[in-house]
């Protein structure tokens, strides 16, 4: 059986928590889009975790978590989250990343921050994680994909 948790582009609507609850029974959990915005908080036997990049399934050793090609992949943040959960006693997650996932670059974050500053009191409340500039590049097909930047033998 397939279960899907799909948001209506509202952002903070509880998708991560619902996915975590359903993850107890899932073999595979796929994060198909989005980036390291506000994130979601998971509380379990290992502790309390604020995830921004990792799919919720990383806490279940029977579950394979997949980051799909629609995700705004912030690689340093991804590595940091994996290190943090492992440090707190979570087994190394089974994690696959699409080779077509596009990478959030530092200039995406810088542009996001500059735009917020430029807008001043009319800013839209960005998390300054580079998501809007990232997706502009993705849809213009000018970004950097994982397949172009990482050695195939690299393990996340």
Positions of PLM-derived features:
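Hydrophobic alpha-helical hairpins/lids featuring a short glycine-rich hinge
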Residues: 80, 84-152
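Catalytic cores of large soluble enzymes that bind and process phosphate-bearing ligands
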Residues: 7-10, 14, 66-77, 96, ...
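Glycine-rich, N-terminal phosphate-binding loop and its surrounding beta-alpha-beta segment
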Residues: 39-113
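N-terminal phosphate-binding or glycine-rich loops at protein starts, especially the Walker A/P-loop
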Residues: 2-34
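Short coil/turn connectors at secondary-structure junctions
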Residues: 1-3, 24-27, 37-38, 45-49, ...
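Gly/Ser/Thr-rich helix-start
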Residues: 8, 12-17, 35-36, 126, ...
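Short, mixed-charge, low-aromatic patches
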Residues: 32-40, 113-119
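Conserved small/polar residues in nucleotide/adenosyl-binding loops
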Residues: 155-156
